[in-house]
Curated annotation (Swiss-Prot):
Gene name tied to this protein: Chd2
Tissue: Widely expressed.
SUPFAM superfamilies: Chromo domain-like (SSF54160), P-loop containing nucleoside triphosphate hydrolases (SSF52540)
Positions of the UniProt region annotated as Disordered: 1-264, 1030-1124, 1329-1465, 1556-1638, 1679-1827
Residues recorded as bearing Phosphothreonine in the entry: T240
Bias-annotated ranges (Low complexity): 15-75
Originating organism: Mus musculus (Mouse)
Molecular function GO terms recorded: ATP binding; ATP hydrolysis activity; helicase activity; histone binding; RNA polymerase II cis-regulatory region sequence-specific DNA binding
Domain notes per entry: The CHD1 helical C-terminal domain (CHCT) may bind DNA and nucleosomes.
Name under which the protein is recorded: Chromodomain-helicase-DNA-binding protein 2
Disrupted gene: phenotype observed: Growth delay late in embryogenesis and perinatal lethality. Heterozygous mice show decreased neonatal viability. Heterozygous mice display glomerulopathy, proteinuria and impaired kidney function. Glomerulopathy may be associated with anemia. Heterozygous mutant also show increased extramedullary hematopoiesis and susceptibility to lymphomas, with defects in hematopoietic stem cell differentiation.
Length: 1827
């Protein structure tokens, strides 16, 4: 201990001297050197202090050594290598931390208001004493005193937990699973982000109660982002500027010695005896020594509130009762969890005070269930490993709690706890678990030493023995207590006989006959009789898995069964400890039970084993031989196969063949042959088939084999609707009159929706309209209104009363979970005890509910079930009555429901009551379903000598709706006419009727003559009956009236009037107006404000229709393109969603359908179906994209809503699909697909050829690992890291997803790495594809600009490509892009550029570019002929100038600004903040117009703010003469502005330019008017468009080259200082309606306005601008005047959306004219010069129709924007101060300032003089505006 202390002090003294130098080097080398990686925190034994914390997880060696130490002497001598390593940052910061804790204000740390629970964490004195008792918590002390044992504490808590406020469940799982490992306090810094990591640390240290998840925050950020995406609308108090960060130095290692535990969960609370807390309250301590709280008397002594705490890193068995005091004394972490628990308890108490006793009872039952579960978690289910401190097991990931003295041979066992997954295992002392769970230890040892383990040498596998029948049940089956029934023994004999004959078979007994037991008996027979010890693989659905496990324990306890399920860590644990004997490498288990899903996930592992037996439960999932599950399983190596299914045939003969082909592929090889032999065309087909099937299929039904099984009687109880139901029913029909009137022209889905609404109405009114929450006087009133709202409930109420008296037990089934809620409420009020099971009730709780109901002497009267819940494996034979509250579309589901009660073991007659509402759709559905189900549903018939077998070739309808449109129309009309005959408001209540009378009149069906779709039903029909039934049904179809005859006209009109009123209300709802502007956001995730707005909008519309969420959809004409539901038949919406998600993970997805099916868990779908869906998605997206682009040609109004941002969307069935994201992902992974060789051998040798940068992971990582990672992505899909890790061929098991969650690479790092590698791949492929064409293009494009070459070094590759990733690039060149010199790129180059753009999608933020690009491409293609005539002066822009670049090791230089997103680092942000301070008010108001302004006023407000801001930016840019600086700072300042609004920088800049342009135009108009009134117009040659482009976009030239003469309007700001073509990394989100599209259309056609064709800041033109100046120094005059105007007016045209007026709309004219104006031709004289003088007025006519003669007249922002004339000079109270004062920011580079800064902004000289000066001087003065 002392040595350790000395060491710390020594370090402390030496550290201060060299801290600064070390910090510098560490910041750079930290990631790769490991000097400050997580290894310091204990994951490496040699890392100094890491080893002091007794980690059990580093390796079992270090673990066992550490275990042997006593708590008093925890630290070990520091290893010498620790001294050599540079000390970690942690070792340099303890002193400062202490200061920081004590004097937070000194360091500017904002203290959270929450109380700090553990100030002592930085208490050097206490921590210096390392492991001494003074530092250990009280609870540990108590434990040590009580048990005289040293408890090993869990080091993961030493420094990891800074509180655990709201730990995510997933993290809990992982955290619990690998307790000692995750040390996340000091994540490994990422090289580029040092300051940010620091801030992360600071923030974490500020709050003791933060979740330990937070510690991962920095780790989660991908390297891609240079800075956080923050909104700067208001400064966050919690944020710290980079200036505030301090370098922290000081003694390290202290944190590691903090012994405090961490709360993982608070399980319960109680009032207990004071001081009765801590170790003495654990379950085992109480059992040994009694409960310290036993003698506590609440009346005599004062108690304290105590909480049952589950500790992090300890299993549930170690949970202790603690009071708040005891927790605070121990300085535990995670007290936030306790706060949350207390808060929740208070809420529950308040709630319990308000609700009825029944609710209280229900709540306490729930609590009891939960505490039962917690108790279960304290039971050891299985011991899976053992270790002693001497014999270790290698790396171990589980918590260990050794309390043993120095070296000892006492073993510890790794325990799997009941009800918890394998990932929750923990090491426990033998002394502890031996007391209660000795049997688990014994069975572990017997398993370990067992000789009955699988061997390939088993004789029976090679040569099957002769069959000997079992005359009676063998002793090894079920012992003495369990007996097989006769037919089960017969089944066992049949299975054994088939095995001896080498026939794989299908066991197809009816549900409830014990197929599970027969299968287990058969395996036990192989095990005992033939010494075949496995391995047996049994694949089962999740719902039956526990019953399989349970039956194995009962019937065959000698067989070692492993249940292989759970998350990755659980499965890894199973493979590590339960799989093979480490010495012999032979399998440990005999049988493995797993689910279909896990089988597919781990098919590589499971498929590598030779199975002696393969059994598939619910094998009808294999009916589709084209499905992935089928294809995967059929490839498994197995010696014998058994399919277990109660329903071997559904729909068609082919399904039966699929099953037969699976078990005996040699015998049933081809479907065509099978069909030919046994097709229905042959008269004796079925008899011959019967003979063929006999050896392979065994089918018994209950009534044949179990004579003792009582009868099943079904009664249909028809009930009247209540008056309220009738009203609702009529209202639904009337409201949907239009849809109904369409008849067969209507949509099936529309009809189905109406039928569903009506079915809901038949069940209960509350399903249509929930009751108002009135203050309920009594439970009785609630009960009455509940019952009166449904005719069925009136009847059920009477029925249940009768059944309760008779002592029956009832199952109530409903399809609708909300109906179950209503029934649960009813049962609660009636005080009937019940259980409930629906899809939301999971796993253990479900099992408990079933056990509770089936238990002997159970009080439960009812069991509520959803018809589809729980699969077929639920046994509720203790019930004798089934109530089917509402029938399913598919009667088969109802039959399964009945069978849950009517099963073997049932001793009473089973009564089934089916409730049907008279005269409604429900009654008609049941009648029709009865007729149809023979053909459409489950049709297998028992195999008997009669040969009556129903085998239809038609596939039947497998979807949930068995009816077509005609039938649905008829169903809807059924009963409606009679209903409408009752006068509205006078609907009759159902007649009171005695329950006995109802039952007497009910239609009764005995099971023998049942017409339900059971096997019994079919045996009553001869095959010949089928065709006639179909005909009869058609003949019986009765004539129906039309809907207009059924629904009275006055009711229809009434509804129409209501709808009209609603529409009018919606039209006048103002909030809708701003929706479009507000929707445009910088990134795709909706902000809070956005969601609030949407909420407001949706509340504005009360519409209940499908369109209610239209606002969230892209604003386009009409609704999203929809793909009809019948085109995706066989897929539910959920399945389609899963398919689409998986579709986006693979390259060329249509060729990878099997992988997609596996990923989407659609393995039982056929490949043909999957292909159909895949092609449907692909084709729909492609055509939607084309349509979208066409639409954009015609109109830009779509640019307003999110459609602009997200591109078009389509609907596949009910699933909305973002077209752009699909196409983007297809393109993204295409490169990978192309680069990976097809040949398997070549694929194994695949290696990346390009140079890659180092990965900086915590494992050795080279280019081979990168290559394997890409192969993994190719094989398993992007993001499926678990599968990649477990694939043995990839050899990445030990490299990725390390167990320690703070070690890299985890998922986030892998994702970043893969994105980077894909980028490199794309670059490599592009280079290959474009060499020749690139050279050619280069030669062509160089010619025009030989005169002037940019000085900056050229950093592009030889094809003119930016080195930046195309996915990041700001300027993805598009296919067919027309350059300004008129040369179109060569086709190859086009293709390559297109690829570049395609791939340009790494971040969702930047992914919007691409559609822009597509539009540009279309436009430019259309117009390329016209453009080709352009002059060489407008030379090629394919090469952009190079400014400052990032030089990154291992990759090419990236120009700054090209590869960065819209974010600023802290320093830049501060500079921008200072510079924009003068317009602070405008910034704040930009997004917050005053309430109550009209749309027009809002527009003006925003425009004014933008003009002020833009002018200010222009002013700031005058400080620079260097082009690159201007470009950079323009970008930065606009990005800064974008933080105040939801638009991105590019959009704002564009809007500003439009507003500016408009202002200039209006000033020009005004000037012309003034001129025409007051004198001759001076000569002003107008610049050609090209010159104007160059001029305006070149910021090193003045943005206002000509001074204003006194009589000219003053120029305001930078005269559109960014060219309209300025490129931004995101496409501009335009927000203009049709009315505004003119100018923009033209811009798009010529790659002009705001498109993607130029880099940010207008550098498209800088290569040739000086050349231009030479000849055209006058050229900009007229043009600039056109933009110089200070006055602008609101347009009188009514607009819907705020930003429309920014668009400069001109009349459409010939393209040549337009081109002339914008593309300079030095040889031609401008046609504009010959145009009439009023041409411009005409030109901009659409912008504004009425222009006042003078100035602005107060309509605009302020006086600042008036026209400036000499006579008005006095109004300018003072000129703007010189730029030196305006930009006094110390950080702005003085060297960049213009030499003319000091000149007066209103320096008036003659235009000639001024222009001559311009010509000679490149640094022009900008005219400064007053803002």
């Amino acid at each position: 201990m002392m040595r350790n202390k000395d060491k710390s002090q020594e370090e402390d003294s030496s550290l201060h001297s060299n801290a600064s130098s070390r910090s510098a080097s560490e910041e750079v080398s930290g990631s790769d050197s490991g000097s400050q990686s997580e290894s310091e925190q204990g994951s490496e034994p040699g890392s100094g202090h890491g080893s002091e914390s007794n980690s059990s997880s580093e390796s079992s060696e270090s673990q066992s050594e550490s275990e042997s130490e006593s708590a008093g002497s925890k630290s070990q001598p520091v290893l010498p290598e620790a001294k050599e390593k540079p000390a970690s940052k942690k070792e340099r910061i303890a002193d400062v931390k202490k200061m920081w804790e004590e004097y937070p204000d000194v360091y500017g740390v904002r203290r959270s208001n929450r109380s700090r629970q553990e100030p002592s964490r930085f208490n050097v004195k206490e921590e210096a004493s390392s492991g001494s008792e003074s530092g250990s918590p009280k609870r540990r002390g108590q434990r040590q005193l009580k048990k005289q044992e040293k408890w090993k504490q869990d080091p993961s808590e030493d420094e990891q937990e800074q509180g655990t406020s709201a730990e995510s469940e997933a993290e809990q799982k992982k955290g619990k699973a690998r307790r000692p490992v995750p040390r996340r306090t000091v994540p490994k810094p990422q090289v580029k982000k040092q300051p940010k990591i620091q801030r992360g640390k600071r923030k974490k240290q500020e709050s003791s109660d933060d979740d330990d998840d937070d510690d991962e925050a920095p780790k989660r950020q991908t390297r891609r982002r240079a800075a956080k995406n923050v909104s700067y609308k208001e400064d966050d108090d919690f944020e710290t500027d980079s200036d505030d960060l301090i370098e922290m130095t000081g003694e390290g290692g202290d944190e590691q010695q903090d012994n405090s535990e961490t709360i993982e969960k608070v399980l319960d609370s109680r009032l207990g005896k004071k001081g009765a807390t801590g170790a003495s309250t654990t379950v085992y301590a109480v059992e040994a020594n009694g409960d310290p709280s036993d003698d506590f008397d609440t009346e005599r002594e004062e108690g304290e509130v105590q909480y049952l705490i589950k500790w992090k890193g300890w299993s549930y068995i170690h949970s202790t009762w603690e009071s708040e005091d005891s927790l605070q004394q121990q300085k535990v972490k995670g007290l936030k969890k306790l706060e949350n628990f207390k808060k929740k308890e208070d809420e529950v108490k308040q709630w319990l005070g308000k609700v009825s006793p029944e609710d209280v009872e229900y709540f306490s039952c729930q609590q009891e269930l939960a505490s039962e579960l917690n108790k279960q978690y304290q039971i050891v289910e299985r011991v899976i490993a053992v270790k002693t401190s001497k014999s270790t097991l290698g790396q171990t990931d589980f918590p260990a709690h050794s309390r043993k003295p120095a070296p000892s041979n006492e073993p510890e066992y790794l325990c799997k706890w009941m009800g918890l997954p394998y990932s929750e295992c923990s090491w426990e002392d033998e002394a502890l678990i031996g007391k209660k769970f000795q049997n688990c230890i014994d069975s572990f040892h017997s398993r370990n030493n067992s000789k009955t383990i699988p061997t390939r040498e088993c004789k029976a596998l090679k040569q099957r023995p002769r069959f000997v029948a079992l005359k009676k049940q063998p002793a090894y089956l079920g012992g003495e207590s369990l007996e097989l029934r006769d037919y089960q023994l017969e089944g066992l004999n049949w299975l054994a006989h088939s095995w001896c004959k080498s026939n794989s078979v299908i066991l197809a007994d009816e549900m409830g006959l014990g197929k599970t037991i027969q299968t287990i008996s058969f395996l036990s027979y192989l095990f005992h009789q033939h010494q075949l010890y496995g391995p047996f693989l049994i694949v089962v659905p999740l719902s039956t898995l526990t019953s399989w496990q349970r039956e194995f324990e009962i019937w065959a306890p000698e067989i070692n069964v492993v249940v292989y399920i759970g998350d990755l860590m659980s499965r890894n644990t199973i493979r590590e400890y339960e799989w093979i004997h480490s010495q012999t490498k032979r399998l440990k288990f005999n049988a493995l039970i797993t689910t279909y899903e896990i089988l597919l996930k781990d098919k590589t592992v499971l498929g590598s084993i030779n199975w002696a037996f393969l059994g598939v439960d619910e094998a009808h999932r294999l009916k589709n031989d084209d499905s992935l599950l089928y294809k995967t399983l059929i490839d498994f190596k197995s010696n014998h196969r058994l399919l277990i299914t109660g329903t071997p045939l559904q729909n068609s003969l082919k399904e039966l063949w699929s099953l037969l082909h699976f078990i005996m592929p040699e015998k049933f090889e081809f479907w065509e042959d099978f069909e030919e032999d046994h097709g229905k065309g042959r008269e004796n087909g079925y008899q011959s088939l019967h003979k063929v099937l006999e050896p392979f299929l065994l089918r018994r039904v209950k009534k044949d084999v179990e004579k003792s099984l009582p009868a099943k009687v079904e009664q249909i109880l028809r009930v009247e609707m209540s008056a309220l139901q009738k009203q609702y029913y009529k209202w639904i029909l009337t409201r949907n009159y239009k849809a109904l009137a369409k008849g067969t022209r209507g949509s099936t889905s529309g009809f189905l929706n109406i039928v569903m609404e009506l079915k809901k109405c038949c069940n209960h009114c509350y399903l249509i309209k929930a009751p108002e929450d009135s203050e309920r006087e009594s439970g009785q009133e609630v009960l009455q209104s509940l019952i009166r709202s449904s005719g069925k409930l009136i009847l059920l109420d009477k029925l249940l009363t009768r059944l309760r008296e008779r002592g029956n037990r009832v199952l109530i089934f409903s399809q609708m979970v909300r109906m179950l809620d209503i029934l649960a409420e009813y049962l609660t009020i009636k005080h009937y005890p019940f259980q409930r099971l629906d899809g939301s009730i999971k796993g253990e709780i479900r099992k408990q509910a079933l056990d509770h109901f089936n238990a002997d002497g159970s009080e439960d009267f009812c069991f509520l079930l959803s018809t589809r819940a729980g699969g077929l494996g639920i046994n509720l034979a203790s019930a004798d009555t089934v109530v089917i509250f509402d029938s399913d579309w598919n009667p088969q589901n109802d039959l399964q429901a009945q069978a849950r009660a009517h099963r073997i073991g049932q001793k009473k007659q089973v009564n089934i009551y089916r409730l049907v509402t008279k005269g409604t759709v429900e009654e008609e559905i049941i009648e029709r379903a009865k007729k149809k189900m023979v053909l459409d549903h489950l049709v297998i018939q028992r195999m008997d000598t009669t040969g009556r077998t129903v085998l239809e070739n038609n596939s039947g309808r497998s979807n949930s709706n068995p009816f077509n449109k005609e039938e649905l129309t008829a169903i809807l009309k059924f009963g409606a006419e009679d209903l409408f005959k009752e006068i509205e408001g006078e609907e009759s209540e159902p007649q009171e009727m005695d329950i006995d009378e109802i039952l007497r009149l009910a239609e009764t069906r005995e099971n023998e003559v049942s017409t339900s779709a059971t096997d019994e039903l079919l045996s009553q029909f001869k095959v010949a009956n089928f065709a006639t039934m179909e005909d009869e049904e058609e003949l019986e179809e009765r004539p129906h009236k039309d809907w207009d005859e059924i629904i009275p006209e006055e009711q229809r009109k009434k509804v129409e009037e209501e709808e009209r009123q609603k529409e009018l209300e919606e039209i006048y709802m103002l909030p809708r107006i701003r929706s479009s502007t507000k929707k445009a956001q910088t990134n795709d995730s909706d902000s809070d404000t956005e969601s609030k707005r949407q909420a407001q909008r949706s509340s504005a519309s009360e519409s209940e229709t499908d369109d209610s969420d239209d606002d969230k959809k892209p604003k386009r004409r009409g609704r999203p393109r929809s793909v009809r539901k019948d085109l995706v038949e066989g897929f539910t919406d959920a399945e389609i969603r899963r398919f689409i998600k998986a579709y986006k993970k693979f390259g060329l997805p249509l060729e990878r359908l099997e992988c997609i099916a596996r990923d989407a868990e659609l393995v039982d779908k056929s490949v043909a179906d999957l292909k159909r869906l895949g092609e449907l998605i692909h084709n729909s997206c492609v055509s939607a994209m084309q349509e979208y682009e066409e639409q954009l040609k015609e109109s830009t109004s779509e640019g307003k809503g999110p459609g602009k941002r997200r591109g078009p969307t389509i609907k596949i069935s009910g699933v909305q699909v973002n077209v752009k994201s699909i196409i983007q992902h297809e393109e993204e992974f295409e490169m990978l697909h192309k680069s990976i060789p097809v040949d398997p051998e070549e694929k194994k040798k695949y290696c990346l050829t390009c140079r890659v940068k180092a990965a900086h992971f915590d494992v050795e990582w080279g280019v081979e690992d990168d290559s394997r990672l890409l192969l993994g992505i190719y094989e398993h899909g992007y993001g499926n890291w678990e599968l990649i890790k477990t694939d043995p061929e990839l050899k990445l098991t030990d490299k990725i997803l390390p167990v320690e969650t703070d070690k890299k690479p985890q998922g986030k790092q892998l994702q970043t790495r893969v994105d980077y590698l894909l980028k490199l791949l794309r670059k490599g492929l592009e280079k290959k594809g474009t060499v020749a064409s690139g050279e050619e293009a280069k030669l062509k494009k160089r010619k025009p600009r030989v005169k002037k070459e940019n000085k900056a070094p050229r950093l592009k590759d030889e094809h003119g490509l930016e080195p930046a990733s195309p996915r990041h690039s700001d300027n993805p060149s598009e296919e067919g892009e027309v350059k300004d010199d008129g040369l179109e790129k060569s086709p190859t180059k086009k293709k390559q550029k297109k690829k570049e753009n395609k791939e340009n999608k790494e971040k969702p933020v930047s992914s919007r570019k691409d559609r822009e690009g597509d539009k540009e491409r279309k436009k430019s293609k259309d117009k390329k002929e016209k453009v080709k005539g352009g002059d060489g002066k407008s030379s090629s822009k394919s090469k952009r100038s190079q400014g400052p670049v990032h030089i990154t090791a291992g990759s090419e230089p990236v120009p700054i600004g090209e590869d960065e997103d819209d974010d600023l680092d802290q320093e830049t942000f501060s500079i921008c903040k200072e510079r924009m301070r003068p317009v602070k008010k405008a910034l704040k108001q930009l997004d917050k117009p005053d309430k109550g302004l009209s749309v027009q006023e809002q527009l003006e407000h925003t425009r004014n703010c933008l003009l002020k801001i833009g002018d200010r930016i222009a002013e700031c840019l005058k400080a620079y003469s260097d082009q690159e600086h201007i470009k950079l700072w323009r970008r930065n300042l606009w990005i800064f502005v974008s933080k105040f609004t939801e638009f991105d920088a590019r959009k704002l800049h564009k809007l500003y330019k439009m507003a500016h342009k408009k202002r200039s135009q209006e000033e020009e108009e005004q000037k012309k008017k003034d001129d025409s009134l007051g004198g001759k117009k001076p000569f002003r040659p107008e610049a050609s468009g090209s010159s104007r482009d160059s001029l305006i976009s070149q910021s090193h030239t003045s943005h206002n080259l000509h001074p204003q003469k006194p009589h000219l309007p003053a120029s305001h700001g930078p005269q559109m200082h960014g060219h309209p073509r300025d490129n931004y990394s995101h496409p501009n989100k335009r927000h203009f309606s049709n009315a505004d599209r003119g100018d923009w259309q033209r811009e798009r056609k010529f790659n002009y306005g705001g498109g993607n064709s130029a880099p940010w800041g207008g550098d498209r033109h800088h290569q040739y601008e000086q050349h231009w100046y030479k000849d055209h120094h006058y050229g900009d005059r007229r043009h600039m005047d056109a933009h110089r105007s200070g006055s602008y007016r609101p347009n009188n045209m009514s607009r819907k959306r705020p930003y429309e007026q920014y668009n400069s709309d001109r009349d459409h004219r010939g393209h040549r004219d337009y081109y002339d104006r914008h593309h300079h031709d030095s040889k031609r004289r401008r046609s504009d010069d010959f145009r009439p003088q009023n041409y411009h007025q005409q030109d901009f006519r659409r912008m504004s129709d009425h222009r006042p003669t003078m100035g602005y007249h107060g309509q605009g922002p302020s006086d600042h924007y008036r026209s400036f004339h000499t006579d008005k000079l006095g109004e300018y109270k003072q000129p703007m101060p010189s730029l030196h004062t305006a930009l006094s920011d110390p950080r702005s580079p003085p060297s960049q300032k213009s030499p003319h800064d000091s000149k007066s902004p209103l320096d008036h000289r003659s235009p000639l003089e001024r222009s001559l000066e311009q010509k000679n001087n490149p640094d022009y003065n900008w005219n400064v505006r007053k803002t």
